[in-house]
C-alpha cells in the first residue's frame, strides 16, 4: 500500500502516553525525589519500539518527551531540539529517555527503584519485602489492551506486578478525570501547533490535569 501513489500518510502532532496519579497510594511514604525516581524507572522499562512495531504498525514515532517531534517553537523553528541554551538529558533521542530500550535501561531502572527504597533479589527481581503492585486503567479498545499487556510484560522484568483494569469508554473517562487510578492510559492530539497546547494541561486548574498535580 505504501507504494500506491494514491496512498498518503498525514502526520498528527500528539503523544500517546501513560499517566501516574501523583496522589496514588503507590507513592505513599515517598519523598518527591523518590516518587520521581519511581516514575522514571517505569518509563525506562517500557519498550516503545516494540509497541510501535507490533501494535501501532502505522509508522508512529516513539515519544521520548511529552512535546512531540516536529512541533513549532513559535519563532519559526522547531521546539524539540538541542541548542546552545538547552540540551535534552538524552542528547541522541532529543528527549528524556533513550530511543531504544537496552539492558542498561533496565539496570538504571533498578537503581532508581533502589533509591526509592525498594530491594532486589540476586536474580534482579523485586524482593518480596518491598513489592510494587500497580493497577493500570485503560478503556476496552483492542489496541489499548495490547499496549497495556506489553507494558505489563516490560514491568514484570524487574518484578513489578501490573494489573490491567479495563473499562467501558465513558466509565474510563470518568474514573480517570476523578483521579480514581494509579496509572492510566492517556493520549493528546494537539489542537494547534504550539507547545503550550501540550503543556497547559499540567496546570493545576486545567480540565485535563488527570495526574492531579496540585490537587
Give short role names for the model-derived ranges.
Residues 1-2, 37, 149-158, 170-181:
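Short helices/loops that flank or line small-molecule/ion binding pockets
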Residues 1-24, 49, 53-62, 190:
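Extracellular/periplasmic solute-recognition and catalytic clefts
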Residues 2, 8-14, 173-215:
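Acidic-aromatic pocket-rim loops
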Residues 8, 135-137, 163-167:
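General small-molecule cofactor/ligand-binding pocket signal
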Residues 18-19, 27-30, 144-146, 172-175, ...:
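Extracytoplasmic/secreted cell-surface and envelope-processing proteins
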Residues 33-153:
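Append "and occasionally in soluble cytosolic enzymes with long acidic Gly/Pro-rich linkers
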Residues 37-40, 44, 52-53, 98, ...:
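Extracytoplasmic/peripheral linker and loop segments enriched in polar/acidic and small residues
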Amino acid at each position: 500500500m505504501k507504494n500506491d501513489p494514491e496512498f498518503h500518510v498525514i502526520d498528527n502532532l500528539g503523544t500517546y502516553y501513560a499517566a501516574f496519579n501523583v496522589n496514588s497510594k503507590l507513592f505513599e511514604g515517598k519523598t518527591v525525589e523518590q516518587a520521581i525516581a519511581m516514575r522514571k524507572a517505569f518509563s525506562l522499562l517500557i519498550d516503545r519500539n516494540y509497541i510501535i512495531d507490533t501494535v501501532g504498525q502505522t509508522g508512529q514515532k516513539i515519544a521520548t518527551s511529552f512535546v512531540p517531534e516536529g512541533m513549532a517553537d513559535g519563532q519559526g523553528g522547531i521546539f524539540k531540539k538541542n541548542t546552545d541554551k538547552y540540551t535534552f538529558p538524552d542528547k541522541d533521542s532529543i528527549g528524556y529517555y533513550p530511543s531504544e530500550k537496552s539492558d542498561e535501561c533496565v539496570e538504571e531502572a533498578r537503581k532508581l527503584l533502589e533509591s526509592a527504597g525498594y530491594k532486589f533479589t540476586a536474580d534482579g527481581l523485586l524482593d518480596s519485602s518491598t513489592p510494587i503492585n500497580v493497577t493500570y486503567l485503560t478503556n476496552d479498545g483492542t489496541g489499548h489492551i495490547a499496549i497495556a499487556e506489553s507494558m505489563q510484560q516490560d514491568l514484570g522484568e524487574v518484578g513489578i506486578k501490573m494489573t490491567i483494569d479495563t473499562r467501558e469508554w465513558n466509565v474510563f473517562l470518568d474514573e480517570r478525570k476523578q483521579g480514581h487510578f494509579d496509572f492510566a492510559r492517556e493520549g493528546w492530539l494537539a489542537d494547534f501547533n504550539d507547545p503550550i497546547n501540550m503543556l497547559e494541561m499540567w496546570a493545576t486548574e486545567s480540565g485535563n490535569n488527570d495526574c492531579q498535580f496540585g490537587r
